[in-house]
């Protein structure tokens, strides 16, 4: 018969290939699929593979002009999710040629661009991605990474301390700079612009940058330590963002910041390249992440957004606090914290890691613990996150009854006490409260903080 066989056909005939052996160059994805009633899981998994690669809803004449076998995504394995009715993990392999080099934007457009609205699925969640070495190598990654940051700041053997300046909206630039100075003077390493501080009528960006730089240099001179303030360069256009980064560089400050999900991956990668070329560290805030990652059965898990950020580039990224959450959360969070920091991470389903990931020497990212934490959490945070992290106490610094500087002192004393105790071989998990209590005996600032935030 001449021509091709027209008409609608089942996806699973072409896109479900259980015998497929995955290649080292394939991008692998693990999707949590919830098919509509009556749709078999193979068909649902194949539909995801098809719609996120070469497929369309019907056979087309132009299929004959290319090699589908070379370019199609393949659903190569399906497993039911324990304890969930009609929910499956579908594993899909994508050939590397489907993706533009060095573009997280294109990677996401391909993998999650279209399929999430698909009729045959009730819900769909991307749980994890395996980025092959060949693709990792097309990205610059973090502007500097953990080791270079430590060298630039001359701070070793402990987590770094930060603080978000509150009230986040409404302060004038001069008062804002004063708050920054107090915190840094008290002993913090960093202070931070809030994610929604960009350039508003009450405080234009240029004024803020100037007063923060002044605060930074004053605190640096008085403490003999290198200080930083994450100047938020996020803006309405890439050009404006780079303009702000350029001004930060001219002021000689060490670090700028970006909201990478609201700003977008294209903007983020642009800024990241600028930061490496100009010696700026880049702090990444994850505003909007919960819109994407909060639903358990639809959207994308944060570990995927974290991996994408490491490719796109950032030196710090917010990654939850673990403290006070559920036990399961702890393992899962530590899973993606390792994915951010380590060079090689083994597959471990108990930690939510679906694939072994080799980062082939791409620099690591420091996880930032931020939100609702205070001095009593310090032992747990030190133990859970280890040295390579940034601990950010917003209210936990500024809420101190005596003011910002004493609040900063309290946090620094608590941290140094925990690090010393750990280095002496004490167990932070069981002796944490006692360690803080002992330290507060010779630090009135810490004692006052302990009083305000009861264990």
UniProtKB/Swiss-Prot annotation:
It comes from the Eukaryota. One of its GO terms (biological process) is reductive pentose-phosphate cycle. It catalyses: 2 (2R)-3-phosphoglycerate + 2 H(+) = D-ribulose 1,5-bisphosphate + CO2 + H2O; D-ribulose 1,5-bisphosphate + O2 = 2-phosphoglycolate + (2R)-3-phosphoglycerate + 2 H(+). Its main location: plastid. Its EC number is 4.1.1.39. SUPFAM superfamilies: RuBisCo, C-terminal domain, RuBisCO, large subunit, small (N-terminal) domain. CDD domains: RuBisCO_large_I. Keywords: Calvin cycle, Carbon dioxide fixation, Chloroplast, Disulfide bond, Lyase, Magnesium, Metal-binding, Methylation, Monooxygenase, Oxidoreductase, Photorespiration, Photosynthesis, Plastid. Binds 1 Mg(2+) ion per subunit. GO terms for molecular function: magnesium ion binding; monooxygenase activity; ribulose-bisphosphate carboxylase activity. It is found in: Plastid, Chloroplast. NCBIfam families: PRK04208.1. This is Ribulose bisphosphate carboxylase large chain. It comes from Lupinus arboreus. The gene is rbcL.
């Amino acid at each position: 018969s001449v021509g091709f066989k027209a008409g609608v056909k089942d996806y699973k005939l072409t896109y479900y290939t259980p015998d497929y052996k995955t290649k080292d160059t394939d991008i692998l994805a693990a999707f949590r699929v919830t098919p509509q009633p009556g749709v078999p899981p193979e068909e649902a998994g194949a539909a995801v593979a098809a719609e996120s690669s070469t497929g369309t809803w019907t056979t087309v004449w132009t299929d004959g002009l290319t090699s589908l076998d070379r370019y199609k995504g393949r659903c190569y394995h399906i497993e039911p999710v324990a304890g969930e009715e009609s929910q499956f993990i579908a594993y899909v392999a994508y050939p590397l040629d489907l993706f533009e080099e060095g573009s997280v934007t294109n990677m996401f457009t391909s993998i999650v661009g279209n399929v999430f609205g698909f009729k045959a699925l009730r819900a769909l969640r991307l749980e994890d991605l395996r980025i092959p070495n060949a693709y990792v190598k097309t990205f610059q990654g973090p502007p500097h990474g953990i080791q270079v940051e430590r060298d630039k700041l001359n701070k070793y053997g402990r987590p770094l301390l930060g603080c978000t300046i509150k009230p986040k909206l409404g302060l004038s630039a001069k008062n804002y700079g004063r708050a920054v100075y107090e915190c840094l003077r008290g002993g913090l390493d960093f202070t931070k612009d809030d994610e929604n501080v960009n350039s508003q009528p009450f405080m234009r960006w240029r004024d803020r940058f100037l007063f923060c730089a002044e605060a930074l240099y004053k605190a640096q001179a008085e403490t003999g330590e290198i200080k930083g303030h994450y100047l938020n360069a996020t803006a309405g256009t890439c050009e404006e963002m780079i303009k702000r980064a350029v001004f930060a560089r001219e002021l000689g400050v060490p670090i700028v910041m970006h909201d990478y999900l609201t700003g977008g991956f294209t903007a983020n990668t642009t800024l990241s390249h600028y930061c490496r070329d100009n010696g700026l560290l880049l702090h990444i805030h994850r505003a909007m992440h919960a819109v994407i990652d909060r639903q358990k059965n639809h959207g994308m898990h944060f570990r995927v957004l974290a991996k994408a950020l490491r490719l796109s580039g950032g030196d710090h990224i917010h990654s939850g606090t673990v403290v006070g959450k559920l036990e399961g959360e702890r393992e899962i969070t530590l899973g993606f914290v390792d994915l951010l920091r380590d060079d090689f991470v083994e597959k471990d389903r108990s930690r939510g890691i679906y694939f072994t990931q080799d980062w082939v020497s791409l620099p690591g990212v420091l996880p930032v613990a931020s939100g609702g934490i205070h001095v009593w959490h310090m032992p747990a945070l030190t133990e859970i996150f280890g040295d390579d992290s940034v601990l950010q106490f917003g209210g936990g610094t500024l809420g101190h009854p005596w003011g910002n500087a004493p609040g900063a002192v309290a946090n620094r004393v608590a941290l140094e006490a925990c690090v010393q105790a750990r280095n002496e071989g004490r167990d932070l998990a069981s002796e944490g409260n006692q360690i803080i209590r002992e330290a507060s005996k010779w630090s009135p600032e810490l004692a006052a903080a302990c009083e305000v935030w009861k264990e």
